[in-house]
Structure formats: structure tokens, C-alpha cells
């Protein structure tokens, strides 16, 4: 045994080249052959193979499939149904899209091929991560369905929000479009084309963040569902580009066309082309004419330019998603530039501005319900009444012939381009008068949402000069003008309040019309009295509409009472007409107020009598229908209760 190990040691360490040459000419002895075999075995063993890298078991190991449980139905599409699911391992909520797998033997091979392609593509999509795209979590294959596990977005799609809330304002459209382009830019940078951008495939979470869904693998899903006998993509032709319909080959520019159609959908609340053509007619029209959908008229110039660039007929002329992210409609830079221009104009004016008001965004808006906050621009006086606007919307928007027109905000100062004012020898746009702004206000709600602009010129030495100053925390430039403006506004509000009060009940309207037709003096005294007593007592308390009698019964008593009031007042007014004004003014006012109070008390008494008669008539009808009578005692008690109930009609 020792000789054996000794020979092995000598063969490993002490062998020389001469021994090898001798072995070539002479056959080796038996111990030497055994030593060579042992040496080769040792060299092939793991002791001498440490330098070789072991196989990576982590890449070879396949993760177990996600265990999930199906929940309620979320939606149903052309290529399958979407359910809510739960990951049984982590508890995460999922959106599971189920695609049917055909059992036909003829198309089984094609089905398996598409399933493998879809699974491979989902594996690639799992590596994508962006806040504006839906994450792919994996696939689970079952006997008759293929389940695609997606990120669950709780808010719903844009199309569902349009059905609930109607068309979006332009500010919301701008926010959603910006996020849509960010997600689309990420997909295009990873060489992924969406192919089916529309409101139904754009999801919104609770924070207003949108996420693109059904991208990348949509082509494989469509082919797989077509083999299974699913219907065509319903509604999608409205968003298709002409090159997609003609099947002449399309690229990322087809997604840009769909972005423009989606913006039209958000602005109008309806799918593009849906008002003019049905689906088949829309396909024929788009494919033959290559025209873009009609652009709405109620959008700004920036939004119009954005849509025209997205809906170019030639695909090569359409901008990319990265270029559209720099458009003024998405960034809103034109609005900021208009604010900077206004700030520079105020800095160069003759009246110095406070240091804290050099930035246009620092203008203060009123958070109270009154209309008392007035900021004076010298002779340009703007009354701000924004009780419901947040601080984020405190920038002043000016509308000119080339300015930014923001349709979603009503708090803007309208500028008339046709009229001009002179400023240091130069001409510029002038502002509308306050009376014109008042004419556009028809309701009380519009008073708190519009910016009233008052313009007057201060003439001196034969030259017209416009002084601009901003004094928010200081007294106004002219207290008399402020008082006059406030009095006009209060008078306007009083008139509107009186008109609204008239519409509350037909009784007051008929009484008011009778007073007007009978005597103008009564009408004037009534209006003056109402204005004097409006704060402590308000308007006349009238019975509710539901308990008021018919118009035929009420129409007689006010007219008779009015005639009586006018007849009783006419001698007194005739006697006082010939007297001097300085001695009989107070007596005439007292007589008018007394006659009016008598007329009102007479009308109230007539109303109460007619109400009692009407209630008694209804009570008899109810008793007759029930077939049972009531005793005189019960009738008197009930009548007493009804009288006490209607003693105060306003309660």
C-alpha cells in the first residue's frame, strides 16, 4: 500500500518531461497506469473545480404562481371580463382580467401560441414602473380562461366619471392630459405602443392620479379573443387614427391621434364622431376623408391649437408625447406670462406699488360674503367678491385678443378690445363700464362670481391721464366714489332680492300688481317702507304655498282691499297736494303709512277668512268621503285649532 501511494506522489510531483518521452516509446508499467487514472479522477473532482462558477439557481428557479380569489365583477369588455381579486398571500387587491380560451381542436395550436406570447410579454411588462401606468403583476392559466393580474385602481375610468359628472372643465382636462402624456412618453421610450387609448382605458384613483391600462399586450389579447369568437372592439373606431383604419401601417403617432380624441371626449363628455356617425359610418368616414373630429367651440385658443397638432392627417406631422408636454395648453405658461406682463405694466405706472404687491399672484381675494373689498387701480376700481374661491385661484386673468382664455374660471376681468384709453401718449385696451358688467348679471349667484370693473377718467390740464395704484390695506382713492359704488351695488342687490321674494308666493305677486295698477303713490310708499323696514322685519309673512287657497278666491280680496285703500287715501292725498311741501311732508308720509297698514291688515283679515272657508270645505269633503259625520263640538274644536295654526302665516 505504501508503494502505491508513493508512486502516486511521484507521478504528481516528480514527473519530468523525460519520463513523458520515455512513455511515448515504451509502454508504462502497471503501477504508473493506475496512478494516471487516480490523478485524472482527482483533477475532475470538485476539489480542483473551485474556480468554475456554479450555476445560478436564482435565475433558474421559477416563482410560484400568485394565489388569488375572485371577487365581484368590475367591468365587461369586448375581450373578456374584469373582476376584483385578492392576493391570498399579501392581501393586496387586484384587478383580474379573464380571457376565454377556446376548446376547439382546430384553433387549439394557435391559442397556445398566443397564450405563450402573452405570458412572455406580461413578464416584460412586469418590469415597468411609472405612477401613470397600471402595473402588470402576472398571469394565471386555468382550464378555460387566462387570468391577467393587474393593479387595482379604485376610482374607475374617465368614461364612467363623464357619465356621473358630465363634461370636465378645462383645468381638469389639462391635469389629466399632462398625466396621460407622461405615461405615454414612458411607454414610447420603452418601445411599447398602447394601440387603444380612450376614456374607458384611463383609470383614475381617489387622489386624481390617472393610470393607463390595457397597453402593450392588447394586440395579443385581441388575437386570442378573436380566436375564441369574441366581438370586435366596440366603440374604439371613434378614437382610431386614419392609418389604423386603412391598415397602412402605424407607429407611435397613432397614439397621439387617440390622445386628441380623448381630450375631445373629456371636453364634450361624449365620444368623438358619436354625434354625427354610428360606428360603421365613422369607420368609413375616417378612412375615406382622413378628417379629424369636430373641435368644440367652448375651449381656449391653446386647447384648440393642441388638438389641431394631435389630429394632423399626416402621421409624420404629429408631435411626440415629449413635445406635447411642452405645449402651453399642458404647461399653462401663457397664463403665467400674461400675469408677468400685467405685473410689469403696474411696476411702470405713475403710482408706486407696495413691495408686497409686485407679484401678481399676491393679490388678496375676499373670503367674506359681503361685497366691500375694493382694490383701486387709480381710476380703475375693481370690486372683488369671491366668497367661494380658494387661494390657489387668486391670479388675475386678463382676456385680450392674443391672451390666454381660461373658460373654467369665471373670476376674470373682461377687457374690450374695441375701446381704447390713452396712457402717456400711447393707446391701449380699455375696460368695460361697471354698468355693462351689471347687465350681464341676471341672478344673485353671478354677483359673487364676477369681477366688476369700474372705469372713469381723471382729466386735468386738457390731457387724459390714467393713474394706476393698488391699495388693498389702505383707504380708497376717493371715498365719495367708493360710497357711490357701494350704494349702487347695494341698491342692485336689494332689487334682486325683491324680485326673488316676489317669486316665492303668488299671493304677494298678485297683491303687488294690484297696488301698482291702482295707485303709483301706494307703490312708491310700499317700496320705501320695505326698504326702511327690511332689516328688522323683512317681507310680509305669507302662508306657505302648500296651504294657500286657489288663485280664484285670492284674486278678489286683494283687489277689493286695494280699491278700498286707494279710495280711503285719495281725499287725504288731494287735501295735502295743495299745501306747501315744507309743512305737509311729514303729515303726508304718516297718512300714507297709516293707509298702507290699514290696507295690509284688511288683506290679512280677508286671507284668513278665505283660508278658514277653504279648510272647512275640505273638511266637509273628507267627512263626506269617509261616510261619517262629526259632532258640532268636535267641529268647533278642530276649527279653533286650525285658526290658531294659521294665525301666523309665516310660521
Swiss-Prot record:
Residues 460-483, 537-601, 618-651 are annotated as: Disordered. SUPFAM superfamilies: Protein kinase-like (PK-like). Its main location: cytoplasm. There is a cross-link at residues 108, 110 (Glycyl lysine isopeptide (Lys-Gly) (interchain with G-Cter in ubiquitin)). Residues 105-130, 605-628 form a coiled coil. ATP binds at residues 74-82, 97. Keywords: ATP-binding, Coiled coil, Cytoplasm, Cytoskeleton, Isopeptide bond, Kinase, Microtubule, Nucleotide-binding, Serine/threonine-protein kinase, Transferase, Ubl conjugation. It comes from the Eukaryota. One of its GO terms (molecular function) is MAP kinase kinase kinase activity. It catalyses: L-seryl-[protein] + ATP = O-phospho-L-seryl-[protein] + ADP + H(+); L-threonyl-[protein] + ATP = O-phospho-L-threonyl-[protein] + ADP + H(+). Residues 464-477 have a biased composition (Basic and acidic residues). The active site is at 196 (proton acceptor). Expressed in roots and flowers. Transmembrane segments: none annotated. GO terms for biological process: cortical microtubule organization. Residues 68-330 form the Protein kinase domain. InterPro entries: Kinase-like_dom_sf, MAP_kinase_kinase_kinase, Prot_kinase_dom, Protein_kinase_ATP_BS, Ser/Thr_kinase_AS. It is found in: Cytoplasm, Cytoskeleton. Residues 570-599 have a biased composition (Polar residues). GO terms for cellular component: cytoplasm; microtubule. It holds the Pfam family Pkinase. PANTHER family: MAP KINASE KINASE KINASE SSK2-RELATED-RELATED, MAPKK KINASE. Involved in cortical microtubules organization and stabilization by regulating the phosphorylation state of microtubule-associated proteins such as MAP65-1. Belongs to the protein kinase superfamily. STE Ser/Thr protein kinase family. MAP kinase kinase kinase subfamily. This is Mitogen-activated protein kinase kinase kinase 2. The gene is ANP2.
